[in-house]
Amino acid sequence: MKWRGFLLGSLLTCSIGLQAQKYVGGDISLLPKYEEAGVVYRNADGQAVSDVLAFFSEEGLNAMRVRLFVDPSHDYDKAVCQDLDFVKKLGKRIKEAGMQLMLDFHYSDTWADPAKQWTPAAWKSLSNEELYQKIYEYTKDCLQQMKAAGATPDMIQTGNEISYGMLWGTEAEAKNNQNNRCYTTSPEANWNRFINLLKQAGKACREECPQAKIILHNERTPKPAVMTDFFDRMKAADVDYDIIGLSYYPDYHGDLNSLETALNTLENKQYGKSIMIVETGYSYAWAIGSDFNYSSTYPYTEEGQRRFTADLIALLNKHASVNGLFWWWPEDNGNKDVTQRWWNAALYNHDTGKPYAAFYELKQFVGAGTGIETLYFPKEGKVQSNGWFTVDGRKLQGEPNEKGIYIMNGRKAVN
């Protein structure tokens, strides 16, 4: 019995070591707002969870992402509230829960994405040279404050979905023109400006958080030629970064074959970078976008969402270069007036407060443990575990309903 316990501990230690290079979690930038509104998060049994981040960690999630706006105070969208003080507090909680922290600089007062990369109002009068210095100083100051607050980031995005550049100008200035945009056919001056901004932001990251990994976030997943043009330019300009970050939403980016093509293309280019899916999500109720519709394969139901998640993870786990998976806005929960009710790809049932099945699939990305790994040996010598598991390590929420082979109490069980 002592020998079995020793072997178990050795296996568990090895398992943890192997898993440490992969990260799974979500962008939980609105969690404090739900908590302030009195939203109750529950576990699979319906019991209220007193510490949501501890619960996430216990369920196998090991990293969380938080967005940061420069000055969100004038935005009408209630979801745009993440100023530096907000992010420091949430970041500290994430770190105290033992998880990795990904900091997502938007370098804007509002949402930054391929359609809009508006310059913060306070920076609108700066020349390009002044803007290079500002992004360096701002990034450096934010990171200094994050460190002082006990919220040192482990991964840093220098821009959000910057496929076509960043800091185009204010919305009033840049909405109806292509100034400062970085398309494949854009003037080299636009790209040079963009690259200088990235280099200055990256310089601040290396100085203040030398252990953190820098992520360049591109969402041109369905257009590999456009995506690789972006990263070819980064390589040619010797931009300093560690991770290629991608967005992948089936409703906007196509089916899993499109994602696999993108991953294969990136790997064949041999950029020497890890790849992370820093944003993903799939609906449990109705379409979140109109570009593509895969409801015939993955119905807009809890089970359809779970199946998509399982298939996504199976695909990602075939690619050794992919070491991160983050669900966007998984914490959306309850029926409080926290923000506009348009997102229906969360991982919580708004009526029951319990996680959807897809929530429990996420940990398969890093390789969930099995009942064999969680055995313990009480004095009377009876071997026990913490539940029923599939042979590939997925914990069930009760006794299995389908026939098959399972693990229970450290032994194979045929149902």
List the predicted regions and their residue ranges:
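Hydrophobic faces of well-ordered beta-strands that scaffold small-molecule active sites
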Residues: V24-I28, M64-V66, L101-F105, D154-T158, ...
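Hydrophobic h-region of N-terminal signal peptides that target proteins for export
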Residues: L7-Q19
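Aromatic-rich peripheral "rim/lid" segments of glycoside hydrolase catalytic domains that contact
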Residues: Y41-R42, E173-N176, T261, T265, ...
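Substrate-binding cleft and catalytic face of glycoside hydrolase catalytic domains
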Residues: A54-K213, E219
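Boundary/entry segment of secreted carbohydrate-active catalytic domains
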Residues: Q21-V52
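Residue-level detector of functionally pivotal "anchor" positions at catalytic/ligand-binding pockets or at interdomain
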Residues: A368-D392
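C-terminal tail/sorting-segment detector
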Residues: I405-N415
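Glycoside hydrolase catalytic-domain groove-lining segments
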Residues: V49-L53, N192, K203, E207-I214, ...
